[in-house]
């Protein structure tokens, strides 16, 4: 029996994608091979690779001014790869810190240049808000401004993306990419690990504006230098072939669902249902300001934290798993990515109400 999986990542996958991957495991479309066995330069995999690129460009409406790269290293890897690729001429960057992931980015970039904290969403309650553009105190002529547009751990999402003029905006969109339409033209660089909404762990999507491909530091490894990767169509080294194949299946699934506008409508409905259950309760609490609440990652706390393990055990008995909050903040967290069905959120809300009544 399949469960409702609320994991923050690796996360729930569309069942249709899993079934197709299973059907094609031993023999991809009459090739007599699994995708795992294909040469990354063979015509079979090249067709998979190109279709994935085309479908992702269509879904996100990526303009011709931007290149799409398939890399490795995950979001954390990009915390080093980004500064090494952009601090060649200007070894300085600004950061808007809204949670744990942008904190890690801020710290990692210090190895490659000077960093400046332009704004922080930290309050006495922890990271609970996305600072407005009017609060950003930018330094003089930084190489870029870094922003994590969705903080997976704290459940903080940035919805208003400012136009910074000539200053490139770099966004870690790992945990909400493909959950809603985005104006890619506003970003110099946008990246995301795959294991949330893109597919399985192993591939990292980097979308970079063409004019930013030639700004790398000399220490940047060739395999992670965006210019080299772009010139070789993400084939400079052996790419994560199976992860790209799975991502391609997810992209086609998203298009069948109606694209990102349709996914946004679903995600608004799911997240509203869950936040309403928290807000109308005296037993559950979410600390994030309403205008900054993530649609993908919903953390909540029980009024009586001694009941946490009881809550998790009861949820598991009802077929709902991976609800434990991150160890750094505690409580609960429901990650409701694209592949988590509305029925799963309804089941969770029903259980939350039942558990509250039993705890009264």
Swiss-Prot record:
It comes from the Bacteria. It holds the Pfam family Aminotran_5. It is found in: Cytoplasm. L-glutamate binds at residue 41. Pyridoxal 5'-phosphate binds at residues 101, 152, 172, 195, 237-238. Its cofactor is pyridoxal 5'-phosphate. Pathway: Amino-acid biosynthesis; L-serine biosynthesis; L-serine from 3-phospho-D-glycerate: step 2/3; Cofactor biosynthesis; pyridoxine 5'-phosphate biosynthesis; pyridoxine 5'-phosphate from D-erythrose 4-phosphate: step 3/5. The keyword Transferase applies. Catalyzes the reversible conversion of 3-phosphohydroxypyruvate to phosphoserine and of 3-hydroxy-2-oxo-4-phosphonooxybutanoate to phosphohydroxythreonine. This is Phosphoserine aminotransferase.
